[in-house]
Amino acid sequence: MANKLFFRSALISTILSYLLIFVGGLVRVSGSGLGCPDWPKCFGRWVPPTSIEQIPTHIDPTSFNIVLAWIEYGNRMLGVIVGFSIIIMTVIAVLYFRNNSKILYSALWSLFLVGANGGLGAIVVSSVLNPFIVSLHMILALFLVSVLSYGTIESYKLINLNKFSNISLSKKISISLIALWGLIVIEILLGTGIRTNIELIAIDNPLYSKGQLLDALNSYKYLHSVLGFSLLFLSIYLCYLFRDDFLGLSKQLIYFIFGMILFQIFLGELMIFFELPQLTRLFHTWGSSWLVGIIII
């Protein structure tokens, strides 16, 4: 009973966290990061204003945009829901899994990470979207979904002991998976850094075309693509290592990871050469964050 209870709470927390990453990405691509210029309130209110007349006199009314304000407010509210979900999960872990270090510590680390990232969200606003703080915010989110995914799969193993009792990965596979996870995190951060630099260059050079903005990045722009193809080759190597795997699910996941990396590279190259909708960038980043969690499984 306790195994299933923790598994459900961990799974819900993981799904909600991925949804939060999506909404956070929507905040980024829509320019809603300062949709609520103060924190934790929004224009001095616990619920965002619906008209300019509701804005306090000490806040510049020209900064108000009802759509951006409610997108940012939705992001914050979802963050609160994720926080409470992880608190419930942690309480279950403390009550029933004090002798299971994998479950207990995954829950405690999740609680720490969601709390730290919530506090960092306030700093993101007060720093006026400082690129370094925004990147750190993303790193903690990736660590959070990784730890949650780990706790979820460990609790699933407890429910299905017969299926997983004789399964162990070789050292070569384990090292390759850890390397793949680390490289994907670095790849996401590189992509975020490139986008941030492009936005900063565009502010100083508003007449630059997309090609000129990319040229201004110099050799930095190639790192993202080179690392992307490195990930592709590493995933091919993992497919080779899993060729004789007796557990079909593991083999299918590795093939799925390979397919997602291939698609992400294709989508990334399209974004370089064509003017695709901003939502394309959102799904590009979100898809990469899913890879981080799937590798843990």
Give, region by region, the residue ranges found by the protein language model:
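Membrane-interface helix-loop-helix junctions at transmembrane boundaries of multi-pass membrane enzymes
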Residues: I92-L108, K171, C239-I257
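Interfacial helix-loop-helix junctions of multi-pass membrane proteins
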Residues: L26-C36, G115-M138, R195-P206, I265-S289
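Hydrophobic cores of alpha-helical transmembrane segments in multi-pass inner/ER membrane proteins
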Residues: V82-I88, A141-I159, F229-Y237, S288-I297
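Individual transmembrane alpha-helix segments
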Residues: P56-F84, S219-S225
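N-terminal signal-anchor transmembrane alpha helix
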Residues: F6-P40, G182-G193
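Small-polar-interrupted transmembrane alpha-helices in polytopic inner-membrane proteins
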Residues: I12, L16-V23, Y105-V124, A179-E187, ...
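Membrane-interfacial catalytic/cofactor-binding modules of polytopic membrane enzymes
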Residues: E187-L231, I236-Y240
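Extracytosolic (periplasmic/ER-lumenal) interhelical loops and adjacent juxtamembrane/interface segments
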Residues: V29-E72, L200-L213
